[in-house]
UniProtKB/Swiss-Prot annotation:
Example of a GO cellular component annotation carried by this entry: Golgi membrane
GO terms for MF: RNA binding
Protein name, per record: Protein unc-50 homolog A
Localisation per UniProt entry: Nucleus inner membrane; Golgi apparatus membrane
Stated family: Belongs to the unc-50 family.
Membrane topology qualifier: Multi-pass membrane protein
GO biological process, one term: protein localization to cell surface
Record bears the keyword RNA-binding: yes
The entry's keywords: Golgi apparatus, Membrane, Nucleus, RNA-binding, Transmembrane, Transmembrane helix
Length: 259
């Protein structure tokens, strides 16, 4: 079971928030608190973040059950502790250095690749996906409109980070051990192993994203988030039939980036 922290009740005995309490629950106040804690490592719960990372592989449903607990105790779905983001950034740095080593990049080239991966691939793409999902879910997936039936933007970004972490570990860490001697061998076994790794990684991303939105009780038709599995399976079969090697394309793209 995921560890939790005790918090004070979110409202007075009459169930109505005072003006001061209401101000503390605004989106701006939550964002300010999150960013402020980003520079205070002693206030972050890294042990809990590590537990979440483990459960994202073994039992991701438990992670989203904790989001339910946070909503009940702190009146927000999104994380208020940036520890997960910090640990994810460390994982990105370590795995990107590993990619630089495997691809025989110089120190400067590896540093440029690191900037691209952190600020574009993770944060930049994450902001776009979170904003798109925030708009789509609030516009088309909410059962009924109301302030209590609103998908927080911060939560959509958390869902992206949750789904991105397993993808990162699979593509940027596990795959490293197979690139030079297996995946880039030029044989069928090479692109079979590489493309299968991509299938598993993207499949994880789709599934954990689905779990994130299906965990919100006020959303409908969340099963449509599983539909990309059909396109993913078709693309996988086509890639094997036509000899496409996704990892080879990724390596060429990374080398092109750091020129």
């Amino acid at each position: 079971m995921l560890p939790t922290t005790s918090v004070s009740p979110r409202s007075p005995d009459n169930g109505i928030l005072s003006p001061r309490e209401a101000a503390r629950h605004t989106a701006g106040a939550k964002r300010y608190k999150y960013l402020r804690r980003l520079f205070h490592f002693k206030q972050m719960d890294f042990e809990f973040a590590l537990w979440q990372m483990l459960y994202l592989f073994t039992s991701p449903q438990k992670v989203y059950r904790n989001f339910h607990y946070r909503k009940q105790t702190k009146d927000q779905w999104a994380r208020d502790d940036p520890a997960f983001l910090v640990l994810l950034s460390i994982w990105l740095c370590v795995s990107t250095v590993g990619f630089g080593f495997v691809l025989d990049m110089s120190f400067f080239e590896t540093f440029k690749l690191l900037l691209w991966v952190v600020f574009i691939d993770c944060v930049g793409v994450g902001l776009l996906i979170a904003t798109l999902m925030w708009f789509v879910s609030n516009k088309y997936m909410v059962k009924r409109q109301g302030k209590d039936y609103d998908v927080e933007w911060g939560y959509t970004f958390d869902v992206h980070l949750n789904a991105f972490y397993p993808l990162l570990v699979i593509l940027h860490f596990i795959q490293l051990f197979f690139i030079n001697h297996v995946i880039l061998s030029g044989w069928f076994i090479g692109y079979f192993v590489g493309n299968t790794i991509w299938l598993i990684a993207i499949g994880y991303y789709i599934y954990i994203t689905f779990l994130g939105y299906s965990a919100l009780p006020f959303l409908k038709n969340t099963v449509i988030l599983l539909y990309p599995f059909a396109a993913l399976a078709l693309l996988y079969v086509l890639s094997l039939a036509l000899g496409w090697n996704f990892t080879e394309k990724l390596c060429l793209f990374y080398k092109y980036r750091v020129r």
